[in-house]
Curated annotation (Swiss-Prot):
Encoding gene, per UniProt annotation: glpO
Entries under InterPro entries matching the protein: DAO_C (IPR031656), DAO_C_sf (IPR038299), FAD-dep_OxRdtase (IPR006076), FAD/NAD-bd_sf (IPR036188), G3P_DH_FAD-dep (IPR000447)
Listed cofactors: FAD
Name of the protein in its database record: Alpha-glycerophosphate oxidase
Location(s) in or outside the cell: Cytoplasm
Major localization class: cytoplasm
Region of interest (Disordered), ranges: 398-418
Top EC group: oxidoreductase
Amino acid sequence: MEFSRETRRLALQKMQERDLDLLIIGGGITGAGVALQAAASGLDTGLIEMQDFAQGTSSRSTKLVHGGLRYLKQFDVEVVSDTVSERAVVQQIAPHIPKPDPMLLPVYDEPGSTFSMFRLKVAMDLYDLLAGVSNTPAANKVLTKEEVLKREPDLKQEGLLGGGVYLDFRNNDARLVIENIKRANRDGALIASHVKAEDFLLDDDGKIIGVKARDLLSDQEIIIKAKLVINTTGPWSDEIRQFSHKGQPIHQMRPTKGVHLVVDRQKLPVSQPVYVDTGLNDGRMVFVLPREEKTYFGTTDTDYTGDLEHPQVTQEDVDYLLGVVNNRFPNANVTIDDIESSWAGLRPLLSGNSASDYNGGNSGKVSDDSFDHLVDTVKAYINHEDSREAVEKAIKQVETSTSEKELDPSAVSRGSSFDRDENGLFTLAGGKITDYRKMAEGALTGIIQILKEEFGKSFKLINSKTYPVSGGEINPANVDLEIEAYAQLGTLSGLSMDDARYLANLYGSNAPKVFALTRQLTAAEGLSLAETLSLHYAMDYEMALKPTDYFLRRTNHLLFMRDSLDALIDPVINEMAKHFEWSDQERVAQEDDLRRVIADNDLSALKGHQEG
């Protein structure tokens, strides 16, 4: 079904003519999951996103459907049980996206090690039990030092005790979002990107009856009426709630920044994903992951209070990650000049404050560490050894971390909360990508109940555990064979086997629709046939409106195919300009925007500063 710029125009028109059952603010994975289940359950559903879908946070993850093995060190069995159960569901409903990728976890004899060999074995066995893969080919393996080095010979040998291998899954985070969005659109949801909520419409009793929004492409104000409104904006959740709490700061969220860096595989060759302690005795672990012909590694985890739309990779972030990687892979000698791409994302962590947190628990008690840290900071301020800002930050940490075991952001729960304010606004916040379906299911259970009680409308929630996303109509037990069959179909449309296989993996059961475009398209100037098909499918069926949408989120060219990117920039912009009938001024603006994003991802400013 078409999902294009024209679809967007019609959706905005219809949203202004109706009284929706549910308006969703936010088009990341949380909002996309809610939209899919709401539309499939028959709710008259609308969704607005102020940027591109997944642009804010959901395209900036570690790109794993991660089981969370490290939580078992903290005995958070419920967290891991929920996570691996939901991971299995995502495999069922989006079988073309998560791919099994066994993870290697080396163990070192050093201060601050997350696991000893014994604890790792216990954790992996429990993990397998929770994931239902005990006594299967996917079950964990304990490795000797020699076996670890046979798999990854460039790992640091000093202090290496051995390791383990356990089942994990790589993910294409932005594709998971757009496939949920497309399915919601097919089921009748009205969806538009680049539309920003600016205020609420309120009735005489102060209850929300809609939203005042702005079309950021036309700068027109839009009035959207809805019986219920849900806020799924991740790190922006507090800002949206602020609309109806003028002058009263809301601190439900505690965003933390995570940075990943990308280098060529030859510079940092790893044959499989590696999850390893930093070696800095800071209680953290990092991933080193092969993708395409590149290797990426991360993440950092630091509190963030800056611009939510444009989190930046700093020199401190780079120094930290390069220090970790060069310590663990001593022969790599990775420098900032080797970094081909990068990304910085914000985790929408909950600050605590008695939120309903199925991933962590919430005692509501200030931890000793938090309290002691505040006392020490106040003493330092009195002695003129610290600043007022440091005291304010320490107070905020106590206010917003009542259930934390320690101050380290890595220890803050990734749990979710579902709340309703006095004005009727629902907010679904927190959580991890893996949990998105369960979060949406819980929220919609409550929303459907409210629609019946307050508006007399009855709906039956679909079984979202078996409801596939767009592209996901593939037998989960037979993914590789079905993808290969689609690829064979692509060769009949004139594609090479490699190109057909790439498109089949990217689009799943939508691949035949992509191949069918060959009936009306030939290779555009400067593009291969496969690139032309992918671009036009993104514009007409995935609401890609800007070159950055295509290069960064509909595909991963900007992250993991940097070698070929420069040659594609002009041909892609030319084709989009022709398709969308851009003026010369608009074409220049789009190119400037793309080159700014590329410069940010390439860390051009940091590299230039070093050279200067």
